[in-house]
Regions:
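Conserved C-terminal helix/tail region of periplasmic/extracytoplasmic solute-binding proteins
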Residues: 163-183
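Pocket-lining segment of extracytoplasmic ligand-binding domains
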Residues: 36-37, 42-127
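Bilobed "Venus flytrap"/periplasmic-binding protein-like clamshell domains
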Residues: 1-65, 120, 160
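A generic structural-conservation signal
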Residues: 12, 33, 57, 75, ...
Length: 183
């Protein structure tokens, strides 16, 4: 309820937007009760820090930077939605390039194995790549699930995300989620 009438910036149609709508719903508010401004993560952080918006939808290193700069976390999304990242190809691409898709999945599997077996080096590589310290990468690591297996909970989350997109006018037609998962 404390967000009523506030300006909130973040990326529309993303998991962060979905978290915002879920969080507002817990306080008996709707998106219309706030002024939502579509913007990327770095822009949202800059707008919040400059006072142009009251709150920002942030994730990963950008969220960590905001917290370290004194921002207060209103919600981390827990209990509102599951953060899910999928890799997708078109049915046509899959039919025309099955070996390439298999190779991609194998490389992904090998990368996850490397992370598990070379954790310290993974922290170092990631820190250098994203401009964080190893300690900051370690702090963010538990927020990510690198398991490529598509679980029933993942399918349910995709269904819920689709409902969110339809309800908010970002997807026109409902699709059968199970029919688009390659097994």
């Amino acid at each position: 309820e404390s967000l009523k009438g506030k300006k909130i910036g973040g990326p529309k149609g993303t998991i962060l937007h979905q978290v915002l709508v879920g969080y507002l719903g817990k306080g008996n508010l709707k998106e219309e009760d706030v002024e939502f401004i579509n913007m990327g993560l770095p822009d949202a952080l800059a707008a919040m820090e400059s006072g142009r918006i009251d709150a920002a939808l942030l994730a990963g290193p950008v969220a960590l930077k905001a917290i370290k700069n004194g921002a207060k976390v209103v919600s981390n999304g827990e209990g509102l939605t599951q953060g899910l990242v999928v890799t997708a190809v078109s049915g046509k691409f899959l039919k025309e390039n099955p070996e390439l898709v298999k190779r991609f999945l194998k490389v992904n599997e090998d990368a996850v194995k490397y992370i598990d077996e070379n954790f310290e080096n993974t922290l170092k590589i990631t820190a250098e790549d994203v401009g964080l310290t190893k300690d900051e990468v370690l702090e963010l690591y538990p927020l990510y699930d690198f398991n490529p297996e598509i679980r029933e909970a993942d399918i349910q989350d995709l269904i819920e995300t689709q409902e969110f997109l339809i309800k908010n006018g970002m997807q026109e037609n409902r699709i059968d989620i199970n029919s688009i998962i390659a097994k």
